């Protein structure tokens, strides 16, 4: 049986595109299948979110030649201020405390990332982007995987990467169970323009209903991720502009002067999901097909990018040695490499959300003192900053800024 591709990727979101670019850029024959229309993916109304790109993730984008197409629309995060509601005690991260010029990360609109990835994907001769199509099912054997596409075609490959999101049909078809629950919270996402410059400072206020994050964007704008009780979010999103602006200003404060909401508003229900396994016969899960975490730390996309970096390294190294890229031993190595990172981050974000998203007075005192204590322990603080930058642990080559 001849392969139509060495690697088949189901899902053309940010992680699926990035894996395709990494592997095709190293010479692998890749087929990427997505049910969406590529033109619609670039529409301003497709996805209103911005992502926090950690330093380690920026290194991946740079190593793959993507960062020059993103940098002009990426706002550096120079400081992070974390406070429990309006408490005087807060945690303050400053990139200068690490003794380097590199920022803690960048805020980039998802549409900017998607545009750069799509353009790069289209330029690679060994990457076939098949859309709008769906992978209807995958049959695997010890020797190959065969996928049925929604247009009746069948593709064979050595390995299938499921980048098909939290509800991953391929994960379910493989019988991979999940641990999951929905939070009684919804994220309201919008963009604001403000009177004063933000100076590259990201702010996170922990309010009783959930975190309220103010993320610096280019041009005196900020992205707002407003976590609210699910039963209230629909009403807030439907408010007239003036009423919504008043509700927003009451939580935002006046430290940046007058604040004006601009552009659409979006809502996203929040959940936690962890797959019990990341692999099956000739199948590997990446990104939200493997894990979904609370956005309290802004680390969801970074977690998926580290999946991509690890899996791409294993695939390309195996191919150079003449090995089968879908071999069970290699897939188990990928699972071992990535699972603990996701488990720890899911536990931390879930714990922080539960600890801070309430108004219980004794808990509030403990967490305020905890934030202040961390702020006064430089070694711990520097470790937490480096961890948030995605540069701790067993790092794939791409995360270290090295080519595959």
Predicted segments with their positions:
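N-terminal FAD cofactor-binding segment of flavoenzymes
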Residues: 45-85
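C-terminal helical "tail/cap" subdomain of flavin- and related membrane-associated enzymes
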Residues: 313-404
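Conserved Rossmann-like nucleotide-cofactor binding loop
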Residues: 15, 38, 167
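N-terminal Rossmann-like FAD-binding beta1-loop-alpha1 element of flavoenzymes
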Residues: 5-32
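Conserved N-terminal helical subregion
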Residues: 2-4, 62, 73-173, 181-186, ...
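Glycine-rich FAD pyrophosphate-binding loop
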Residues: 24-49
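FAD/FMN-dependent oxidoreductases across multiple families
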Residues: 234-329
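Conserved FAD-binding catalytic core of PHBH/FMO-like flavoproteins
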Residues: 61, 144-148, 153-154, 159-258, ...
